[in-house]
């Protein structure tokens, strides 16, 4: 699926070097097919890096995907040039009257911060409330899962004593579920979080269906039966080097982090890590776009009036 992005977005050249099909807006305008409109609320500090990761995964299906990047934090960024944010990101006020086929809410390094202490917590709640009437399907990733469970289901913040970091094995619970269609019975995916997601908590306090979990009984992938909301507690979008960058950053900060589990060959940080989750990440996002977005979204978004009820 060619993703449609602004002509000058840095990800265009970055992904073309990997032979990822990226279609600029100027080229796409000549095609008579409605692209899927996907809004990405990017909460990660290194926004360009995160854009590259998610756009790579959104590029693997047969239809156009029209990407709109959203920011809700008006503070000056220390990791992303202001010019980039001004050129490629919109504010909520710019899109609040629009409808979208899909919304992705990324993770954020806020695992040890109380919800009410998050600078943009009111804006997060506003976007989630807005999405009920303006988005066909929303995918929450890592910290965004924890935030959404609190806002939508009233589940208090669950925090691990130690950070979960590494590449972990998961198994699917419903082989014929659409979101896990084509998954291996067991698969690997990276995690980098303090948030805790016990499967029992999800089963006891929500109506969500758990589709995949870790060997330790943590929920990894779960969704509503109407496909309107889906949750992934790990980081299937991560590059091969992302966990290494986080590890060495924490080492330099004197935090004495554990070596990411099952990541560096022979558990030696001097060895170059290899991504063992790429096929899983691509299939997950392809399934979400196809079965949770494309198959149920209306052709004319002006007529969309979805509800979570």
Swiss-Prot record:
Task of the protein: Transfers a succinyl group from succinyl-CoA to L-homoserine, forming succinyl-L-homoserine.
Active-site annotation: 142 (acyl-thioester intermediate), 235 (proton acceptor), 237
Feature type site, description Important for substrate specificity: 192
Organism: Escherichia coli O6:H1 (strain CFT073 / ATCC 700928 / UPEC)
Regulation: Allosterically inhibited by SAM and methionine.
GO cellular component annotations of the record: cytoplasm
Record pathway: Amino-acid biosynthesis; L-methionine biosynthesis via de novo pathway; O-succinyl-L-homoserine from L-homoserine: step 1/1
Enzymatic reactions: L-homoserine + succinyl-CoA = O-succinyl-L-homoserine + CoA
Keyword Transferase: yes
Keyword match Acyltransferase: yes
Location(s) in or outside the cell: Cytoplasm
Quaternary data: Homodimer.
One BP annotation, GO: L-methionine biosynthetic process from homoserine via O-succinyl-L-homoserine and cystathionine
Protein name according to UniProt: Homoserine O-succinyltransferase
Main location: cytoplasm
Residues engaged in binding substrate: 163, 192, 249
